[in-house]
């Protein structure tokens, strides 16, 4: 059986990166092994083959040493393990991981596929110009570069990736774990709104809460409640965003309407989907330039469950949320339009049911983890058949197909 190494120059695996795990387990024709730096949540994301390099703090000890060696582009521990395992394909997750392993690609003879996810395109090259130079070398050495959607693909090409090497490979979800359920509520009853994500500026949570406050003013007597799943990661930026969120709750006197559950495992998030009527996800481009890159996987899961999604025309979100069909889209930062659309959804239970049904269809057609696994297998095979980097599977998209 052919071997694919999934390499991530960071910990395997944060609870919010379940979308990466879906890529590991849905290509059964390839044996999967993980290379990483430290581990967490192994009970949630079990994997039979795993090699952790330099586990520990990134500021001292083995973790710091491994980080320094990665920066040279010639980490001897990584080189030794690649020599032992002799993989057919290395699938690097995030741009820096691709660069760190790319120096071994020719001498070890593996195909190198690198997936970009957002921050590695939108922020890293801007904040640290050396990454533009490093990406140039990666684009020369690597075989294929995968992104979630056409918007992200264009950004990758702007960074210098050859267009023929940049492919759209969607992030799928396990449909058997997210069942469809129509939310049939009586008109005039309480409408429950769900937000989910880390407290980062790009998530737009302050805009979401402001929209709720404005909606209550637009339609007196409307009953809205909000559940927030997520929290600050403890960083300075995360704590600042948390204070902005709490400030909006206080400003619009939403204390009695908002429940904050903190971080929750994915199973708890999925359970909460069925207790709510509208998924609110108004992503924005952060002041740092950070953005979603593609689209939040939580939007895909919410749509799969049969819930309409209210979001923004941000990155590749329009590839999931079809305005007026599976939910509504408004411009980034337009809280007035967001509030108006929220009132519209809250006032029309039958429209919510119809949009939820259409959302499920879109997810089944385009975001089934098993189908995306088939596509990923085809990508791997195209790179180990003697024509690495010169041929792609016929069904892999270079740009968005119209619905």
Description of each model-found segment:
Residues 274-291, 307:
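Acidic donor-binding loop of glycosyltransferase active sites
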